[in-house]
Amino acid sequence: MIKPLSEQYVSFLHDESRLTGEAADISFPQTVGEVKTVVAQCLALKVPITVQGARTGICGGAVPRRGHLMNLSEMNKPLNVLKGNDGAFYLTVQPGYLLSSLRRDLRTRRFEWLDPALVDPAALAAFSQAPEQFWPPDPSELTASIGGIASTNSRGPGAFKYGSADNFIAALQVVTNDAEEHEIKDDRDLLEAFIGGEGMLGVITALTLRLQSKPSEMWGIGFFFNDENKAAGFMDQAVAAGLPALAALDFLDAVSLTLAGELKQVAAKLREIPETPPEARAAVYIELHGDSEGEIEIAAQELMEAAETFGSDPDTSWALSGDETEKLRLFRHAVPEAVNTRLDQIRLDYPGAVKMGGDLTWPGISFAESLAHYRRDIEKSELTAVIFGHARDNHLHVNLLPRNEAERQRAADLMAAWLDHSRELNGRLFREHGVGKIKSELFLNHEQPREIQSWRELKDRLDPDGLWNPGNMFQEVVE
């Protein structure tokens, strides 16, 4: 069950962050029993365990520092469908179950792998006859595992309307330091500690997801602007409109559009997407969700008129509905993919290059003010940067791409200043990507002291020997 970390497994030593680690051995458990066996063997010998899902993280949280690497990709099935007293449906899944599989199975309602010992036939029958369900967090990275999404409390494009994953996770099964499985359901504080805990407290072996009826109307709209400041003004007006149907409101700067366009030339999945207007300096991506076509049409018309007042040409806008909106999501998701491709190119000349990506919020000020602040700092620093992200709480992902050691230091200083500004505004310093190993120093130097202390106390209580995912959040000290 536990295998030496030989050459055939070296790809498991890194994730999308491009950080590479090391481990002595690896396992691919398929059952809870196998997880418990591996955990018992490792902890008895004080061997650290790094828990890993689909390796789509960008902060190195699933990259091992040493010890044992437990990959959960073989625990990839749905287990049970329930109907709650609230009338909602709940789906219990294994942690390695991919978001793409969840979306497919909810669409087709074919759950061949459900455990017959668990399933209530009446609940399954009701589910098969109910309107199509969906899981609202729905991050844009379809190859992410549900366990991984939970471990960073990730959000999708629809976070403007639905919030984070923890709003739609009702219960967890976890194996902890006693090598036994425990259910966490009623203790919401403990549940939310594991959701977003980055594998530092134990291994998630099952998750119960709260589903919701899929809106019958789902529209995707893209507006293009020749001036990013006008795009920012439109973002603020769209937020102020308070439209109930507004599910996603994202910003992409000129570099984002250029990089996504370059990726479009070589990625088959993007070829059906129209070309962006050559003069565009920014874009705003919108999703509208609702059950009334009339409501969606009114919201779309209001947004289109507002965009036009800020200089967006309606003839260049994109508008798709239903399953076609996935094309726009693919374009939006192409931006971080393209950033990683550009980082790989930089590494040819600067092997130590690491992307410094912001994942913080600046609440209480306008989106336009936030964007202007970032842009002013970037221009002063003369760094290469890509800006994209969400309107809610001005949650922008500012990616800095240093090309040499001097730029790396300037990027680190700039990121530190932005984190401090977020703290001054009572924002979130690490919102949806986690801290992992890449941002642990930033976490310790800039997070609110009470937040650091809370995590430290929890870690000491549930993992006193520091054997679960060492190096995440807290810098590991090896004696």
Which positions does each model-derived feature cover?
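C-terminal substrate-recognition/cap domain of FAD-linked oxidoreductases
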Residues: P4-F12, F224, A232-D413, A417, ...
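Activity-critical C-terminal alpha-helical subdomain
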Residues: K439-E479
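N-terminal accessory segments
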Residues: M1-D25, Q41, L45-I49, A54, ...
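N-terminal flexible segment immediately upstream of the FAD-binding catalytic core
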Residues: M1-A40, T56-F89, D105-T108, S256-L263, ...
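Short acidic/histidine-rich active-site segments
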Residues: H390, R428-V435, P470-M473
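Short beta-strand elements
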Residues: E74, A170-V174, E192-G196, G202-L211, ...
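Flexible, low-complexity linker/loop segments at domain and module junctions
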Residues: L211-M218, E275-A280, E479
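FAD-binding subdomain of flavoenzyme oxidoreductases
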Residues: P78-V81, T92-D250
